[in-house]
């Protein structure tokens, strides 16, 4: 009986180890507070691209208030579990 349990344990462990991380493409939005008033859309897009690197695509960067830029786009997220804050995403 112990051999059966050991065999099941090894099979389950190997499946978990081999599954690895899941990869998701997610929509994201962020904002950047600035020192200068009334930034242009071009300035905001540049700031969004500078701030958001590492597997992130900036689709829009625009002036949203007197001292703030809003950034939107997509990012690639690798996670072992779907419950790790994965929202507004689809698996790729």
From Swiss-Prot:
- Record PTM: Contains 3 disulfide bonds.
> Which body tissues produce this protein?
Expressed by the venom gland.
Does the keyword Disulfide bond feature in the UniProt annotation? yes
Task: Give one GO term, molecular function aspect.
Answer: toxin activity
* Alphabetical UniProt keywords: Disulfide bond, Ion channel impairing toxin, Potassium channel impairing toxin, Secreted, Signal, Toxin, Voltage-gated potassium channel impairing toxin
Signal peptide coordinates:
1-20
Q: Which residues form a coiled coil?
A: none
Gene Ontology CC terms, in alphabetical order: extracellular region
Query: Which compartments is it annotated to reside in?
Result: Secreted
Task performed by this protein? Inhibits voltage-gated potassium channels (Kv) (IC(50)=about 10 nM), when tested on DRG neurons.
Q: Which family does it belong to?
A: Belongs to the scoloptoxin-15 family.
The name this protein carries in UniProt is Kappa-scoloptoxin(15)-Ssd2a
Query: Per the UniProt entry, what species is this protein from, by scientific name?
Result: Scolopendra dehaani (Thai centipede)
| Highest classification ranks of the organism | Eukaryota, Metazoa, Ecdysozoa, Arthropoda, Myriapoda
């Amino acid at each position: 009986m112990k051999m059966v349990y050991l065999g099941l344990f090894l099979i389950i462990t190997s499946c978990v180890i081999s599954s690895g991380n899941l990869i998701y493409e997610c929509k994201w939005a962020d904002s950047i507070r600035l020192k200068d008033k009334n930034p242009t859309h071009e300035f905001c897009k540049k700031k969004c691209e500078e701030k958001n690197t590492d597997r992130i695509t900036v689709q829009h960067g625009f002036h949203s208030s007197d001292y703030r830029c809003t950034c939107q786009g997509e990012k690639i997220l690798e996670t072992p579990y779907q419950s790790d804050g994965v929202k507004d995403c689809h698996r790729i």
